[in-house]
Amino acid sequence: MSEIVIRHAETRDYEAIRQIHAQPEVYCNTLQVPHPSDHMWQERLADRPGIKQLVACIDGDVVGHLTIDVQQRPRRSHVADFGICVDSRWKNRGVASALMREMIEMCDNWLRVDRIELTVFVDNAPAIKVYKKYGFEIEGTGKKYALRNGEYVDAYYMARVK
């Protein structure tokens, strides 16, 4: 397999990112609804305070996306949360791990982030396994956290504290 290259997401990446998030295997594990608009993705990739966007590329193609949101409130400025997705054709090939390593490196050494938070549906075992691999722990459960395919699903609150 070719090398996984992690870089900052550019506006030109929005179509590839939109296509990844439009995959049913991907959006069912996010809070996104089906059929996101081009405009929404263009806005999401615009520069915003506290937001860092990374993409994973293989042979120049975007195969993964991670957004870091560093809290802007002074008393929570040491905290970030993130969302991650991987093209379903590239699952189980190290893409999520490469994005996670780079995100943790940025948070630990460049962004003064001591706590990284996330939510994950309780039935998303592959994602939970990756998060635990990088030191995230389950801190609680949100009952009926979100609606997915017509049914409520619970989510874990997880965090990694430096």
UniProtKB/Swiss-Prot annotation:
EC number: 2.3.1.-, 2.3.1.53
PROSITE patterns: GNAT (PS51186)
Pfam families cross-referenced by the UniProt entry: Acetyltransf_1
UniProt keyword annotations, A-Z: Acyltransferase, Transferase
Domain of life: Bacteria
InterPro entries linked to this entry: Acyl_CoA_acyltransferase (IPR016181), GNAT_dom (IPR000182)
Catalyses which reaction(s): L-phenylalanine + acetyl-CoA = N-acetyl-L-phenylalanine + CoA + H(+); L-methionine + acetyl-CoA = N-acetyl-L-methionine + CoA + H(+)
Family of the protein in this entry: Belongs to the acetyltransferase family.
Alphabetized GO MF terms: acyltransferase activity, transferring groups other than amino-acyl groups; L-methionine N-acyltransferase activity; L-phenylalanine N-acetyltransferase activity; N-acetyltransferase activity
First-tier enzyme category under EC: transferase
Name used for this protein in its record: L-amino acid N-acetyltransferase AaaT
Sequence ranges assigned to domain N-acetyltransferase in this UniProt record: 4-162
Function: Catalyzes the N-acetylation of L-phenylalanine and L-methionine using acetyl-CoA as acetyl donor in vitro. Cannot accept L-tyrosine as substrate and propionyl-CoA, succinyl-CoA or (S)-methylmalonyl-CoA as acyl donors. Is also able to acetylate and thus detoxify several nonhydrolyzable aminoacyl adenylates, but not the processed form of the peptide-nucleotide antibiotic microcin C (McC). When overproduced, provides complete resistance to leucyl sulfamoyl adenylate (LSA) and partial resistance to alanyl sulfamoyl adenylate (ASA) and phenylalanyl sulfamoyl adenylate (FSA).
Gene3D superfamilies registered for this protein in UniProt: 3.40.630.30
Organism from which the protein derives: Escherichia coli (strain K12)
